[in-house]
Amino acid sequence: MQSGTRWRVLGLCLLSIGVWGQDGNEEMGSITQTPYQVSISGTTVILTCSQHLGSEAQWQHNGKNKEDSGDRLFLPEFSEMEQSGYYVCYPRGSNPEDASHHLYLKARVCENCMEMDVMAVATIVIVDICITLGLLLLVYYWSKNRKAKAKPVTRGAGAGGRQRGQNKERPPPVPNPDYEPIRKGQQDLYSGLNQRRI
């Protein structure tokens, strides 16, 4: 497959993923509205009762009434251990057991967190892979071109351009007497191997 075709296929894949992500968002809009909205910003969690009760709204957390807060319940410095649980919004003066919807909230909050959807994560991963592959191809072609431009190295040409092989004018060098083989008739200390039997 040619490199131009690869880039076209990659662009088509990225485009189809983007369209797929937009289709998912449209489907989410067609779902009926839930009676609660949860907003998390930093360590603050805000629960909104969408029944439009205004100041007549009463909140209950795990069976205990919360202070008067209207249709919005602010939970600053949210603690996952202490403030997670069942929340219910109901009209003041009515029984919370009669409320049609309950909310189970378990959230993890932090100071500098960012919420990312699946499409953002998928886009980051795909772009990272594309950049990595692009750098790999760049280094590959750069090293291939550099290798082709380099001068070939011939062996033996370093000594003034002389050819290899034995020079007919000069005899072979005399062997070094320090490395002569041991003579068979010689009985020196180191003239033979130690043949001690155990």
From Swiss-Prot:
It comes from the Eukaryota. Its main location: membrane. It is a single-pass type I membrane protein. It is found in: Cell membrane. GO terms for cellular component: alpha-beta T cell receptor complex; external side of plasma membrane. Residues 188-198 have a biased composition (Polar residues). Residues 139-198 are cytoplasmic. PROSITE patterns: ITAM_1 (PS51055). GO terms for biological process: adaptive immune response; cell surface receptor signaling pathway; positive thymic T cell selection. Residues 1-21 form the signal peptide. The keyword Thylakoid does not apply. Residues 22-117 are extracellular. Residues 152-198 are annotated as: Disordered. Keywords: Adaptive immunity, Cell membrane, Disulfide bond, Immunity, Immunoglobulin domain, Membrane, Phosphoprotein, Receptor, Signal, Transmembrane, Transmembrane helix. Residues 37-107 form the Ig-like domain. The chain crosses the membrane at residues 118-138. The keyword Transmembrane applies. Residues 169-196 form the ITAM domain. Residues 166-183 are annotated as: NUMB-binding region. Part of the TCR-CD3 complex present on T-lymphocyte cell surface that plays an essential role in adaptive immune response. When antigen presenting cells (APCs) activate T-cell receptor (TCR), TCR-mediated signals are transmitted across the cell membrane by the CD3 chains CD3D, CD3E, CD3G and CD3Z. All CD3 chains contain immunoreceptor tyrosine-based activation motifs (ITAMs) in their cytoplasmic domain. Upon TCR engagement, these motifs become phosphorylated by Src family protein tyrosine kinases LCK and FYN, resulting in the activation of downstream signaling pathways. The TCR-CD3 complex is composed of a CD3D/CD3E and a CD3G/CD3E heterodimers that preferentially associate with TCRalpha and TCRbeta, respectively, to form TCRalpha/CD3E/CD3G and TCRbeta/CD3G/CD3E trimers. In turn, the hexamer interacts with CD3Z homodimer to form the TCR-CD3 complex. Alternatively, TCRalpha and TCRbeta can be replaced by TCRgamma and TCRdelta. Interacts with CD6. Interacts (via Proline-rich sequence) with NCK1; the interaction is ligand dependent but independent of tyrosine kinase activation. This is T-cell surface glycoprotein CD3 epsilon chain. It comes from Macaca fascicularis (Crab-eating macaque). The lineage of its organism: Eukaryota, Metazoa, Chordata, Craniata, Vertebrata. The gene is CD3E.
